[in-house]
Amino acid sequence: MVHRMMPVVAEAAGLPFKHEPVVLRRSRPQVRDYVIHKFDEDLPPADLNGLQSALRLFGLIPDSLELRPTMIDLLTEQIAGYYDPDSNALYIPADIEPFQLRVVVSHELVHALQDQYVRLDSIITQRHVNDRRSAAQAILEGQATVAQIPVLMPEQKPDTLPLGWFWKQRTVMAAQQAQMKEFASAPLWLREGLIFPYLGGADFNVWFRRKYFGRSILDSMPRSTEQILHPERYATHDEPTELAFEGRAGDVKWEDGLGEFETRLLFQQHLGNEAEAITLATGWDGDRYQVLGANADVLVWYTVWDDAAAASRFAAGLQRAWAKRRTVGRSDIKQLTVSGRPVVRLVYAPAGWSGWSSIPTIKLSGGGE
């Protein structure tokens, strides 16, 4: 099957295979063991605790949710096969249904092809650059989603689909996955985060193939989910502004950024309106947060915006969103100007936090309109 699919996948992806990957069968317990191994490798205990604290402080996951078992159960439920860069092999569950086999192999075969041109491990294991990593995952999963279509439906030409078509299938995909126990009970951040790389990434790939016919997206990958959501920003080389915290390194439990897509999810989670969330996150140009404190109970989040209007709109929305979530500490949302750029700062911490008088500051570099 793999040998027959390879020419079609190669043509759809616009890249020839350098060699044929191996296909191996695995039992469900072996698949789960692989998920656990990869999860623990990607998020060692200190990183896991830091990320979990951040997500709780943002209100993206409940305080009662333990991230590790939740994600392991969810990923185990979702995985119908996988490509492992370490062994250059496709792994297929031994109990996979025949009708699923072509779908899984065609998709994972694209990942095997991608790995022959870029080091997948170096892309998907980037640390403390969440938004850039999310954008890269969207390219990889989106390309695989688009390239597998000619294998499964030769009469369908992905390049003829209207732009945005894949994202419009999100409700259908979510409804199908909602029949799965772990997915149905997962927080919005997890559910949407699983779907976005496939559908949002597929839409970007279709746009790229039309705009830059004959070029490989793997040669110049987007650096932010903003560029995935707004491809014209990629075309105009609108790179995100880099934010760097100054001082307090010894007190930091975790540091990263949300990006435009997860900023959308933050508003969608707390305000319950997707259209409004999209509006409030539009104009994002960069962000960075730190989790501080002995108990990892302090959040300092800076966002930089394309213009003052976008910053004001975001700040007002954040005030409403934060008022709607259950908080036990003190919060402070301020509009600032840093290096001539409009910035919004959120601080959420216990009222007695000693750092209220010396809140960490940031410096900016790159980006901008």
Predicted regions and their residues:
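Pan-zinc metallopeptidase signature
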Residues: A178-Y302
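Auxiliary, metal-adjacent structural segments of Zn-dependent hydrolase domains
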Residues: V2-L90, A94-F99
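Post-HExxH zinc-binding segment in Zn-dependent metallohydrolases
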Residues: M5, D115-D121, T125-M173
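Acidic helix-start/capping segments at beta-turn-to-alpha-helix junctions
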Residues: K18-K38, R127-D131, P162-T171, P222-E226
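Short pre-active-site segment immediately N-terminal to the catalytic Zn-binding motif
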Residues: L90-S106, V129-A136
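C-terminal soluble interaction/assembly domains
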Residues: D285-E369
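Extracytoplasmic/secreted envelope proteins and their assembly/folding machinery
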Residues: V2-M6, A10, V103-H107, E141, ...
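Catalytic glutamate of the conserved HExxH
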Residues: V104, E108-A112, Q116
